[in-house]
């Protein structure tokens, strides 16, 4: 069976694997290496950074080539920035597996959740202008905003939108987007989600708050949408002329990469999805290349000014976006659109992104004004994050960690666990017929749905989007729910691979009648009750 990853992990910014446990393993490994190494290499002087970059190039290129071959990455581009200079930039491989067109430093890739740092910077710009304040209450800016807990609703502030500590489950209600519900429905759905931890205490990666954050920034700036703010406040001043944020712009480019996903048998091309990640807006909709992203990195390294001296954002509010808000582990923290990872020779501030077929990583060492960008046309195995951290560790003189092996091993283990969970028992209990249970249902987050029969096959159809989840017998009254690859969902289903999205089970009321269909997501375990109408 092909090696794939689950729905919610697709847009997480934490590893191309989009799995925080993978990163935790890497952080633990770095901690152990730091503690057991006799001593770190001498910290490089600022005047030697460019020389160190050039000296690293042969081993860097050897490392890239070996790892691309190891996990069958079709194409990749990397850039290393020192101050306002792109010191090293190169493309490797091809834009499409089996094709002849080579990747270069102008090839467009989706950057996924590396977009989130652009969002936090536009927030900082609005704060500079007094149009927003970091501690503004969200209900004062959007009276329709509501969480399950009334106290959390009142206390939720602007900085909370990006701090990944909402108290809700990881990737809360992201599944609504993959199943075609619009952004407003997703934002509204958070009022129905039960918290799993106390507000502001525990890291849990989410995307929907970033969609709302983009709307709030746009409203504060008087813009049509967040992308308009991105264009006028960051892309235009920096001259990022190749950077876009739509499916049409991506496919219109004569030099764009094609997405692939890893399988045990090698990478396979994935269908281009017109909606994802673009329908996730400020959470992950940017397309860019190495040359443009180098300009973005230079802005961060310069504390908010362009090479020409134009101030885009104040150093104070930009630094606030790099300030930790919640612990990821005992060795890493989440800020606003950035992860902050202490190392023996300085903090690395980074974020990555993963979409259907693409992975990206941006990493900064602010004290040394050093940055790395990695863009790839293969998702799910974590090469950009591993390569980015490996490169900075080498340049900073940190103890070495084999991130690529760690992330790949964890990825395979995660997949194996998923396969075991959904494998049908050898001697399953007979499943009751679903035809008598067909009818209309509703869920607060999804809205109306209908369980319909097509011959002997049952499918739950979401009225708001037309998405269909096929129910297949698993064990007794438990079924698996798999997205039917029809219409606009064909690309989504293909990208998700063969594993089901959820388990489905009918639950009886006090009179013993099956009145509720519960869907429990395979990834993360979030449950949705569809009640018979």
How should these model regions be labeled?
Residues 72-75, 356-359, 445:
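Short, small/polar residue-rich loop motifs at catalytic or cofactor-binding pockets
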Residues 49-111, 131-133, 140-141, 146-148, ...:
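Short, conserved catalytic-motif segment at the N-terminal edge
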Residues 91-97, 150-356, 360-364, 379:
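Short, surface-exposed loop or secondary-structure junction motifs
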Residues 13-33:
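Bacterial N-terminal signal peptides
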Residues 39-41, 389-533:
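Peripheral terminal and inter-domain segments
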Residues 1-15:
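N-terminal secretory signal peptides that target proteins for export/translocation
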């Amino acid at each position: 069976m092909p090696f794939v990853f689950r729905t919610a992990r697709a847009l997480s910014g934490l590893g191309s694997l989009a799995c925080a446990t993978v990163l935790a393993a890497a952080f633990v490994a770095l901690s152990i290496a730091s503690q057991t190494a006799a001593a770190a290499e001498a910290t490089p002087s600022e005047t030697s950074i460019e020389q160190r970059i050039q000296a690293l190039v042969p081993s860097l290129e050897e490392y890239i080539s070996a790892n691309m071959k190891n996990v069958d990455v079709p194409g990749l581009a990397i850039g290393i920035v020192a101050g306002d200079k792109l010191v090293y930039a190169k493309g490797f491989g091809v834009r499409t597996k089996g094709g002849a067109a080579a990747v270069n430093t102008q090839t467009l890739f989706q950057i996924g959740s590396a977009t989130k740092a652009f969002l936090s910077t536009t927030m900082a710009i609005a704060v500079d202008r007094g149009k927003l304040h970091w501690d503004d209450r969200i209900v004062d800016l959007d009276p329709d905003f509501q969480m399950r807990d009334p106290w959390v609703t009142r206390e939720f502030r602007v900085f909370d939108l990006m701090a990944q500590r909402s108290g809700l489950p990881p990737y809360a209600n992201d599944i609504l987007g993959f199943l075609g519900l619009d952004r407003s429905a997703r934002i509204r759905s958070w009022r129905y989600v039960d918290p799993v931890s106390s507000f502001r205490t525990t890291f849990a990666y989410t995307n929907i708050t970033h969609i709302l954050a983009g709307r709030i920034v746009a409203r504060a700036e008087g813009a049509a949408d967040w992308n308009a703010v991105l264009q006028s406040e960051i892309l235009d001043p920096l001259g990022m002329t190749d950077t876009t944020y739509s499916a049409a712009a991506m496919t219109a480019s004569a030099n764009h990469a094609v997405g692939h996903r890893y399988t045990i048998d090698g990478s396979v091309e994935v269908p281009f999805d017109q909606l994802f990640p673009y329908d996730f807006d400020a959470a992950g909709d940017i397309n860019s290349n190495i040359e443009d992203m180098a300009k973005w990195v230079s802005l961060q390294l310069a504390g908010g000014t362009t090479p020409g001296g134009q101030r885009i954002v104040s150093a104070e509010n930009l630094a606030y976006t790099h300030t930790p808000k919640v612990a990821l582990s005992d060795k890493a923290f989440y800020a606003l659109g950035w992860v902050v990872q202490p190392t023996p020779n300085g903090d690395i501030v980074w974020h990555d992104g993963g979409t259907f077929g693409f992975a990206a990583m941006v990493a900064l060492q602010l004290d040394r004004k050093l940055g790395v960008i990695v863009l790839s046309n293969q998702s799910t195995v974590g090469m950009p994050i591993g390569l980015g951290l490996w490169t900075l560790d080498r340049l900073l003189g940190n103890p070495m960690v084999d991130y690529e092996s760690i992330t790949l091993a964890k990825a395979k283990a995660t997949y194996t666990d998923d396969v075991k969970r959904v494998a049908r028992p050898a001697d399953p209990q007979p499943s009751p017929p679903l035809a008598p249970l067909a009818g209309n249902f509703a869920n607060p987050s999804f809205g109306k749905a209908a369980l319909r029969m097509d011959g002997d096959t049952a499918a739950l159809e979401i009225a708001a989007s037309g998405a269909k989840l096929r129910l297949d017998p698993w064990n007794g009254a438990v079924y698996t729910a798999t997205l039917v690859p029809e219409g606009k969902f064909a690309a989504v289903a293909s990208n998700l691979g063969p594993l089901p999205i959820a388990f489905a089970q009918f639950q009886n009321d006090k009179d013993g009648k099956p009145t509720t269909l519960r869907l429990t997501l395979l990834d993360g375990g979030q449950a949705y009750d569809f009640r018979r109408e």
